[in-house]
Amino acid sequence: MKFSRLAGSLISGWLLLSVVAGCGSSDTKTGSATETTAPATTSAPQTAATSTKKTILFYGNSLTAGYGVEPTQAFPALVGKKIDSVGLGYTVVNAGLSGETTAGGKSRIGWVLRKPVDVFVLELGGNDGLRGLPLSATRQNLQAIIDTVRAKSPQAQIVLAGMQIPPNMGTAYTKEFRELYKQLADKNKLVLIPFLLENVGGIPKLNQPDGIHPNVTGHRIVANTVWQVIQPIL
């Protein structure tokens, strides 16, 4: 795998508050976007458009960005290795930014999708939930991102990563947050990952010392969760 930087970073973390958690942050953001080719042949971002390889783009917050681990240890890169292992020709692009909200994701999606993609993995909303933002806005922002992907890459398979949050905002809010992912997936006929952090969220040994971010082992489990869902569509 060979990685290259595509964008600058946004700094802030996401809060893992209980067994089911999302990702939150402050308003100051840092993060990075990286690209890897499966199998690796170049580090130039332009290659995805000029080669015959297909492109899978991971679009999310600190979970996708791999906060606190090396780019090669984050789950998108690990999924790329799995793609290599079965001989599929994909360029894997990590467009995760730590601290990202759905509003932020909506604002930058046009820039990110300057080139067409074949598979788009959408992982956003955790920061919205942990901040208690109106879920009507979260839903609208996610729908806008989906609509933009469909407009710019009509052939793309869209995968939506479900998230859950602790009950701090109340039972009704927590339930509505959890269910909006399936509702959006059903409405738009998306491929759904029911819960991205399945078997990782809230488990100390699978998270970094801050108890917030998945560690290397945690990212391996997340990669397996993602791979089980996306392998059939590649």
Q: What do these predicted ranges mean?
A:
Residues 93-101:
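Short beta->alpha junction loops
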Residues 64-70, 102-103:
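Short, solvent-exposed loop/turn elements at domain surfaces
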Residues 106-234:
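Alpha-helical cap/lid subdomain in secreted, periplasmic
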Residues 73-74:
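Short Gly/aromatic-enriched secondary-structure transition segments
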Residues 1-59, 67-70, 84-88, 114-115, ...:
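N-terminal secretory targeting modules
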Residues 61-62, 126:
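Active-site metal-binding loops of divalent metal-dependent hydrolases
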